[in-house]
């Protein structure tokens, strides 16, 4: 009876499976250090609820470096049972051959050993040259050969198909739900009525501003008598006979209506639509309202002085005032058009199932500088060393997880369907595409020398000595070991580029092939470096841009030219108006400002449209 009470109160033995309310302690996970758990005394193992890591502690509560013991095999032979074999996830067949895996291992090791410590004085120079260095070693050691290209591409296509299948299924399900569901009107009637009233106030505000400036400007005198009589009849509706001081106080009401959204009703009926340009619309409205209030305040203060100035200069009493109203008439129209055109409602993207015919895939040509051809090429030389056997000594680990390689191929497989071209061929095409007016200099034959290459850490000592001395190849073959060497172009202007392998500028000249095989002297042969195209691109201002970007740049150039022509013709037109209407400098400045705003809007609108289309 007494023992049952103890068990009921939770004071019994903890080994009987009953949780005790006493003896609990709070511990912190050793791995995430964020979650505190309550465990009972005597517990040596517990699992964190956040990171799901298993913590092992000793009797004092200190963390233990726990390693599960290896299971011991029983000496006795137990009964044998037939067990069905299930395919494991680790039985994935890699689409890469041993050659690709070895190249991937070389690339990964060279990239890992490239950057020095952050405390190194030339760390920024190394980091800046990292993209060129990575590109050069990927050209020397291609991570995907021509034999594996099809299988890797098929695997990527299968992955893309699965991803597209999931995305397409989601869009189809979502579009089906949108078609079947009825979109309710979430806004009350009071909001709709208020939106209509603000729209009426917005229209009346801008219409009154435009008509008021038109009525008091010199343009009204050029209109026919019938239209002039219509303006006289509309005086009582648009406050056309009001002075500048009255209109100034009236324009303060514009803060309640100028920020009206004309697409609010459409966006509420179509929740899936998006409205772009809302911020630019509000900024343009606020800027116009501030400019208008400032100008009206100045007109109301100095209206009498302007009239006196007109009489002193033997002009009509209100001639200057009419010019100012004419200028603000065009400015108001300009700001109204620009502000409303900033708003762009955009429907959701549509999904169409179209039968697209893919072009036949071409095999990518294998680079002649592959690691497996080094031995074959160097064996033809009398003083060459078999690079294949040397490089295979440190490439013994096979890459099973090819995430870097597959991601690299996934980024370039879409663009590089065509066979690869040599750097010089690609450079010649770019130079042929340059305009005739561009200051293109004839290509000079550079000379190169390599010192302290990071490849020397991986290549055996015998090959490394050859690399550090001077390694040159023929002009028809890319350099095997010289990755991003320092280049000095000798001509009218000397261009020196310091690259990370030797921070100081390396200057060397090509020597004639005077050595013989086995005489202990290093042979130096003139060559064209691997990264020659990139260095000529910098000196000639060439850019490796895709076709879409080049088209966009052409559109930008054309629009800027048209805008300049528009401004020039408009200025000539205003110069002609000076002789006829005797415009003063202030009115001329207002007209020019209005034209400049229109031209800027034209350029910005037509420039960003192709950029959004390409993106």
UniProtKB/Swiss-Prot annotation:
It is a multi-pass membrane protein. GO terms for cellular component: chromosome, centromeric core domain; microtubule organizing center attachment site; mitotic spindle pole body; nuclear inner membrane; nuclear membrane. It is found in: Nucleus inner membrane. Keywords: Membrane, Nucleus, Transmembrane, Transmembrane helix. The chain crosses the membrane at residues 192-212, 247-267, 323-343, 563-583, 586-606. Pfam families: Ima1_N. Residues 357-387 are annotated as: Disordered. This is Integral inner nuclear membrane protein ima1. Residues 374-384 have a biased composition (Basic and acidic residues). One of its GO terms (biological process) is nuclear inner membrane organization. Inner nuclear membrane protein that specifically binds to heterochromatic regions and promotes the tethering of centromeric DNA to the SUN-KASH complex. Couples centromeres to the nuclear envelope, thus contributing to their association with the microtubule organizing center attachment site and to the positioning of the nucleus at the cell center by microtubules.
